[in-house]
């Protein structure tokens, strides 16, 4: 990390490193890079939106728009990046337990870069976490809301 700005990384964390922490793979790997990271508190992720993504075939023909649920999922994956590195929660998988106060403010289309800032609100007993997220394109809010996560045990 650099000392210029708390959380600023000397080099962005690439998708190959993200995939060591998260189970998501194409077509549901929705974070291309982590740009900023403050352990246990906050991460900023980037998703490059390309026309080649499978959901654009049907959403919406001749006017491709990234589905809102995938914007929320992308923010959740940034949240998962934070959670899976917290002490005692390594090698864990956190699933959605709920979403609140989600709003979609502008469309996200091929060619955009969705910048997602996700911050931890609370973590309880290393099992339940609440976070707030905001996704922007060109400095404009595209999606925002709160996400609730629950730790799953696969045994």
Curated annotation (Swiss-Prot):
The keyword Lipid metabolism applies. GO terms for cellular component: cytoplasm; membrane. It catalyses: a (3R)-hydroxyacyl-[ACP] = a (2E)-enoyl-[ACP] + H2O. HAMAP family: FabZ. This is 3-hydroxyacyl-[acyl-carrier-protein] dehydratase FabZ. CDD domains: FabZ. Belongs to the thioester dehydratase family. FabZ subfamily. The active site is at residue 59. It is an enzyme of class 4 (lyase). Keywords: Cytoplasm, Lipid A biosynthesis, Lipid biosynthesis, Lipid metabolism, Lyase. GO terms for biological process: fatty acid biosynthetic process; lipid A biosynthetic process. It comes from the Bacteria. InterPro entries: FabA_FabZ, FabZ, HotDog_dom_sf. Involved in unsaturated fatty acids biosynthesis. Catalyzes the dehydration of short chain beta-hydroxyacyl-ACPs and long chain saturated and unsaturated beta-hydroxyacyl-ACPs. Its EC number is 4.2.1.59. PANTHER family: 3-HYDROXYACYL-[ACYL-CARRIER-PROTEIN] DEHYDRATASE. GO terms for molecular function: (3R)-hydroxyacyl-[acyl-carrier-protein] dehydratase activity. It is found in: Cytoplasm.
């Amino acid at each position: 990390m650099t000392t210029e700005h708390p959380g600023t990384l000397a080099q962005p964390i690439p998708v190959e490193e993200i995939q060591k922490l998260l189970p998501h793979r194409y077509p549901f790997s929705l974070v291309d890079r982590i740009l900023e990271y403050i352990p246990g508190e906050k991460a900023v992720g980037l998703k490059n939106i390309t026309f080649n993504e499978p959901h654009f075939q049907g959403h919406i023909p001749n006017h491709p728009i990234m589905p809102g649920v995938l914007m929320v999922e992308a923010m959740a994956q940034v949240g998962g990046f934070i959670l899976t590195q917290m002490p005692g929660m390594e090698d864990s998988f956190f699933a959605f337990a709920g979403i609140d106060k989600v709003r979609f403010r502008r469309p996200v289309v091929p060619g955009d870069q969705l910048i997602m800032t996700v911050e931890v609100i609370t973590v309880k007993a290393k099992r339940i976490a609440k976070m707030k997220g905001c996704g922007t394109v060109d400095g404009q809010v595209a999606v925002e809301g709160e996400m609730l996560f629950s730790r799953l045990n696969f045994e």
